[in-house]
Amino acid sequence: MAAKLHFFVTSLAFFTLAVMTSGHWNNNQPNQCQTSVPSCFPIKPYIRVTLQAKSILQTPTFNYVAVVTLRKQNLLGFLEKAVDTNYGFRFSSSYFGSALGYMVDKINGTAASTQNQTFWQISSNGTALNCGVSTYYPRNNEVILFNFTTYANAGHV
């Protein structure tokens, strides 16, 4: 029970951080985040998710694609599996405690920077997600893009 409560608090807090730091909360956009504890039963189905990491702002540039099949879970789990199964894919994240959760800050050596006003924007079908890797649960056959961009390019200034 304590683990479920911890997961709930982490998910809710990270959702709040994602909304506060995104700077583009859109009340017309449906809530994309899972803020409640998912049921353990029935067993979740396997889903296939394509992860794309794209960086063209600085060298080395890259456009990396990993296709991952796992039981339905949060986006962080799919990133971890991509590292396990695809030797060319690496990421790091910072954990901000149970109140805030995880935030991806580096993919394949390219790091987000508040000084340079760059970050890894997460989107699906051209729509920026309003939550992060701890609370977003991809759908089957979804393509998730991690695009290295600037605050200005993403409309956050």
What residue spans do the PLM features occupy?
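Ubiquitin-like/PB1-type beta-grasp interaction modules and other compact soluble beta-rich domains
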Residues: 2-157
